[in-house]
Amino acid sequence: MSDPLLFVLLGPTGSGKTSLSIALAERFGGEIVNCDSVAVYRELDIGTAKPTHEERESVPHHLFDVLPPTEPMTAGEYARRAREVLKDIASRGKLPIVVGGTGLYLRALLDGLFAGPERSEELREHLRRREQERGPTYLHRILSRMDRVAAAKIHPNDAAKLIRAIEVCLAARKPMTELWQQGRDPLTGFRILRIGLDPDRPALYDRINRRAAEMFEQGLVEETQALLAKYGRIGGPLDSLGYRQAFELLDGKLTREQAVAAAQQGHRNYAKRQMTWFRREPEVRWLKGFGDDAAIVGEAMQIIKTS
């Protein structure tokens, strides 16, 4: 008896993954598993472009809204939870459909991650203080000297990931990328089918620009204001794209027009980094279009039927 099928849908932000995943889930009796590092958090709705309540009612969705924004979700913890969900879905005879754009989460889920050293709160606090003293790019410059490959994969403003990478390099006394291949625990028990969305770049950027502007129109600043009142400046998911620019607007550092433009630019840059990461994924069947194009939906369905 062959292993059950696991369908993985990759693609940059704005490429129509949600639309395609729901169409496939409805057609093949599937259940959708989130693989986005910000969508796991409750109360962050407008800035994450999560599936709507109506979309979530049409087919089962998993690993959305599972944590408050004060609790960190590491890639390893995500992989542990997601593997449990995948096994449960498959045990009920349903098709698990992993959807998302966070490359590190996907790698942790499918390939496993090395067991890194324990966290050092003393070192972390020291690095946070140094960043405050020397500016927002300080941590990225430090990591670039220790591990250029890791630094290239982490956004210069993502302090949490930069601190963890520096911590690992110092504890192991070698670049973190050398450790990534050690002690991994790849996912077994599934036939993995990967499909990636690769829409026309100018058309994708146009969609990204429109969606980022719509987030502000739909109340992103007000949502950010409510999160600030409830949790304070906690960083983490509240430092993600959109929310970061909303904070700068609230602080008076940007006008509304500037905040929208900065969010648009940030999302475009993020889409470019996502595609760079996903191009390194093995055995991906790339579809040249958006996930809500009828031709792309039909092509994806045909691939699943013959797998």
Swiss-Prot record:
Residue intervals passing through the bilayer:
none
Q: Has the keyword tRNA processing been applied to this entry? A: yes
Q: What is its EC number?
A: 2.5.1.75
Q: Name one GO biological process term.
A: tRNA modification
Required cofactors, per record?
A: Mg(2+)
| Sorted UniProt keywords | ATP-binding, Magnesium, Nucleotide-binding, Transferase, tRNA processing
Q: What class of enzyme is it?
A: transferase
- What reactions does this protein catalyze? adenosine(37) in tRNA + dimethylallyl diphosphate = N(6)-dimethylallyladenosine(37) in tRNA + diphosphate
Indicate which residues the UniProt annotation says bind substrate.
T13, G14, S15, G16, K17, T18
Where are the annotated segments for Interaction with substrate tRNA?
36-39
Which molecular-function annotations from GO does this UniProt entry contain? ATP binding; tRNA dimethylallyltransferase activity
**Is Plastid included in the keywords of this UniProt record?**
no
Pfam families this protein is in? IPPT
Q: Which InterPro entries match?
A: Dimethylallyltransferase (IPR039657), IPT (IPR018022), P-loop_NTPase (IPR027417)
Site described as Interaction with substrate tRNA, located at: T102, R124
Q: Which residues hold ATP?
A: G11, P12, T13, G14, S15, G16, K17, T18
Please give the function described in this protein's UniProt entry. Answer: Catalyzes the transfer of a dimethylallyl group onto the adenine at position 37 in tRNAs that read codons beginning with uridine, leading to the formation of N6-(dimethylallyl)adenosine (i(6)A).
Q: Which family does it belong to?
A: Belongs to the IPP transferase family.
* Alphabetized HAMAP family for the sequence: IPP_trans
Assembly mode: Monomer.
- What's the protein here called? tRNA dimethylallyltransferase
Q: Which organism is it from?
A: Koribacter versatilis (strain Ellin345)
